[in-house]
Every structure is written in structure tokens, then in C-alpha cells.
């Protein structure tokens, strides 16, 4: 299932989370094992995927077995000073433009709230996390920080840096895409990190 979620400027995250919650609850009635569900999100969708999994936990709904984050926005405040250094090499994302869009998405919700900055949320008890991000993108420093946070908390995850690659590189028809997809398939099928 690939939901087309409501977007800014006409809607904010609340409408999207309501839609995703309805879809997810319906899915839970149709499957035997929630651990067979995989949530995948790229860019803002990666932010949504992780924040949504955290919301599911708060609502005491079953976790998906796997959460795949492709170049996710993990900290919508964009306060990491390292990000500015990477911004110079990022052909797709600028911090100021990204922050403006996140502010529209957030509405009156603070940018450091886990729904906007999921690395600030409760990371315990979520589905297995696989994270990939290009090393030439603005979001790379936060992805490294997030991976270290997960390591420090003893949370199993897979971090797959896309060396010398750009934002959402697995969506482009390049050889690195195929390598990532093969790794991802192995991780999801074997359930080993």
C-alpha cells in the first residue's frame, strides 16, 4: 500500500497521521502478524515513517516489523552545525527552504516535537530500523548522530551510508540503488540486522 498523503500548503501533519492511522488499523484487521509489515519513507516521508511508528507506540498499536528510512528529516530544527557544511555539496536540499516547508507542515507544533523531529522521540520498542542517506547531503550529519544514538541505546538497526551520493539516491536509476535494494531485501527477508 502506498498512500498518497495530504500535503502542504493545504494540510499539515495531523491530516496525514489521521489518514495513516485509519489505513494502519484497517491493515491490522487483515493480517495475522504485524511484524510482517514494513513502513518505508523517503525524505519527508522518512520523517513521517519514524514519527508515525513512535505515535503507534504511544497509542499502544502494534509496531511494524521494519521501518525503512531513506534520507529522512530526523531533526526539523536543522540545528546541527555540521549540516551547513554538507549543504554546500547538496544539489537538492537547502536548510532554509527545508525549514520553511517543515514549519508549514508543523502548523503550531514545535519543531523539536517528535512528530517533526523524530530523533527526539522515544526510540525504544520500535520495529527494526534501516537507515540510508547519501554522504553528500545536508541530512547526513543528523543520520550519523541518529545512528550513534541508537547504538548508545542498544537499539539494533542498520545504517547504510551512500558514499558520495545525494538525497534519496535509491530512487534514481543508478547502480547504487540496486545495491541498496539488494541489501534491504536481505535485511527484511532474513530479519537480521
What do the predicted segments below correspond to?
Residues 1-193:
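Alpha/beta-hydrolase superfamily serine-hydrolase fold, recognizing
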Amino acid at each position: 500500500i502506498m498512500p498518497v498523503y495530504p500535503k502542504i500548503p493545504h494540510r499539515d501533519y495531523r491530516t496525514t497521521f489521521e489518514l495513516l492511522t485509519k489505513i494502519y488499523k484497517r491493515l491490522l484487521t487483515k493480517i495475522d502478524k504485524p511484524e510482517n509489515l514494513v513502513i518505508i519513507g523517503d525524505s519527508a516521508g522518512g520523517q513521517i515513517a519514524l514519527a508515525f511508528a513512535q505515535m503507534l507506540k504511544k497509542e499502544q498499536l502494534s509496531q511494524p516489523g521494519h521501518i525503512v528510512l531513506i534520507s529522512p528529516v530526523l531533526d526539523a530544527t536543522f540545528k546541527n552545525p555540521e549540516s551547513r557544511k554538507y549543504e554546500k555539496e547538496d544539489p537538492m536540499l537547502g536548510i532554509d527552504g527545508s525549514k520553511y516547508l517543515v514549519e508549514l507542515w508543523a502548523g503550531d507544533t514545535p519543531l523539536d516535537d517528535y512528530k517533526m523531529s523524530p530523533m527526539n522521540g522515544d526510540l525504544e520498542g520500535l520495529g527494526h530500523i534501516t537507515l540510508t542517506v547519501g554522504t553528500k547531503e545536508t541530512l547526513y550529519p543528523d543520520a550519523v548522530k541518529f545512528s550513534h544514538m541508537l547504538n548508545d541505546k542498544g537499539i539494533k538497526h542498520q545504517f547504510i551510508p551512500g558514499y558520495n551520493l545525494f538525497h534519496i539516491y535509491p530512487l534514481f536509476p543508478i547502480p547504487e540503488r540496486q545495491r541498496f535494494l539488494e541489501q534491504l531485501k536481505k535485511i527484511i527477508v532474513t530479519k537480521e540486522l
